[in-house]
């Protein structure tokens, strides 16, 4: 399902700043490629995607008592939409 692959929108200071340029930021499944991300976003939100930029943030350590591990990996995608399209980020 699309919901499982596109995990959540990112609401950070930078993500809200680039909303003015019609760019949206999502955390997506690590195995997705740029063409797959583009197809998923266009299908899910019925918008036209101009470009997709991705990056993989560094792993973060998590500690619970004496046990140490890492948080699961993810990929962050910055989606640029065609002028006139928008994605609602509020819950329905």
From Swiss-Prot:
Keywords: Chloroplast, Plastid, Ribonucleoprotein, Ribosomal protein, RNA-binding, rRNA-binding. PROSITE patterns: RIBOSOMAL_L23. It is found in: Plastid, Chloroplast. GO terms for cellular component: chloroplast; ribonucleoprotein complex; ribosome. Disulfide bonds: none annotated. Belongs to the universal ribosomal protein uL23 family. Binds to 23S rRNA. Part of the 50S ribosomal subunit. PANTHER family: 60S RIBOSOMAL PROTEIN L23A. HAMAP family: Ribosomal_uL23_B. This is Large ribosomal subunit protein uL23c. It comes from Nephroselmis olivacea. The lineage of its organism: Eukaryota, Viridiplantae, Chlorophyta, Nephroselmidophyceae, Nephroselmidales.
